[in-house]
Regions:
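Conserved beta strand-loop-helix elements of the APE1-like EEP
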Residues: 136-152
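Active-site-adjacent helix-turn-beta-strand microarchitecture at beta-sheet edges
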Residues: 160-171
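S-adenosyl-L-methionine-dependent nucleic acid methyltransferase catalytic domains
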Residues: 1-135, 139, 169-290
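Surface-exposed flexible segments
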Residues: 9, 156-162
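Proline-centered turn/helix-capping motifs that create local helix->coil transitions or kinks
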Residues: 152-158, 174-177
Length: 290
């Protein structure tokens, strides 16, 4: 619940996805951290439960303020929650609560990304079906919040500028990555076995890979304080960055170790695909534009 092993001002970029407050599959984790949360849910006090869950995350956000370098970035994937507590159904806006906390810590909120998750489930709509004034809008996106600590990062020495140039991405990648809407296939939040808690906030490899290449340079240090299955670390390795990963549940260690064993093939495949897509783009551009 703290980042005591991480030195002050040692992290260039945080990329993470925490447990989502007010999503039922995370209740057991939050109530284990603070039994008052269970009491709030039993009393049907949704607002209090929501606030107490977010206060548990606040302890990590406060630590992040300590470990992130001046001019460093924080990227957080988070979803809002809809839930019926007692007889009251409503939205619990996690992204707003987290943004408020980071602003209070002195971070600058930057433009966000909406991660649109496609779903074709015929029963995805909530409420009274075809009858008006009783149905609810279905949430089909999550947020990628972006914060900066202090002002713009400067690259003043020849070595710094050289590393920055070596870390450049392709023109067409910039156009996609810096759009405010991403459509990426998500990773189902379920167990990898009965020995592992029956949920994790795993996101697709492409999500941290993009963010790491957007907001850091080669040799930087990337932190994920909610490491889960290790995706952020894998993306950092693929991007030639250093990685610090911290995970509360020790049962994930075997999953992370297995992922590291198979990482070379995954990384090489990802880089090869990226180059092939760039070559295809250049060929198409040359045919169409001359």
């Amino acid at each position: 619940r703290t980042l005591s092993t991480v030195a002050n001002g040692s992290v260039d970029l945080v990329v993470t996805s925490p447990p989502y407050p007010m999503i039922e599959m995370w209740d057991s984790l939050f109530t284990a951290l603070n039994p008052d949360i269970a009491d709030s849910l039993q009393r049907n006090d949704g607002y209090q439960a929501f606030e107490l869950m977010n206060r548990e995350l606040d302890t990590i956000w406060e630590e992040i303020e300590r470990v992130v370098k001046e001019n460093g970035f924080v990227c957080i994937n988070i979803g809002d929650a809809t839930r019926k507590i007692g007889n009251q159904f409503q939205l619990y806006s996690n992204h707003s609560r987290i943004t408020s906390k980071f602003v209070s810590l002195g971070f600058q909120p930057l433009p966000i990304v909406l991660w649109k998750k496609t779903t074709n489930a015929p029963n995805k709509f909530m409420g009274s079906g075809m009858l008006p004034a009783g149905a609810y809008i279905t949430l089909e996106h999550e947020y990628i919040l972006v914060f900066r600590k202090g002002g713009k990062r400067e690259f003043t020495t020849p070595d710094q500028r050289s590393i920055r140039n070596q870390s450049a991405y392709f023109w067409e990648e910039r156009n996609i990555w810096f759009s405010d809407t991403w459509t990426l296939k998500g990773v189902k939040q379920t167990t990898h076995g009965e020995s592992v808690r029956e949920r994790n906030a795993a996101y697709t490899f492409e999500l941290p890979y993009r963010l790491i290449n957007m907001y850091s340079v080669k040799g930087d240090t990337i932190l994920d304080p909610f490491l889960g299955t290790g995706t952020t670390t894998f993306a950092a390795i693929a991007s030639e960055r250093n990685s610090i990963g911290i995970e509360y549940d020790k049962n994930f260690s075997s999953i992370i170790s297995e992922g590291l064993k198979n990482l070379e093939k995954k990384v090489n495949g990802s880089i090869t695909r990226r180059l092939e897509e760039h070559i295809a783009f250049c060929s198409k551009y040359q045919r169409e534009k001359g």
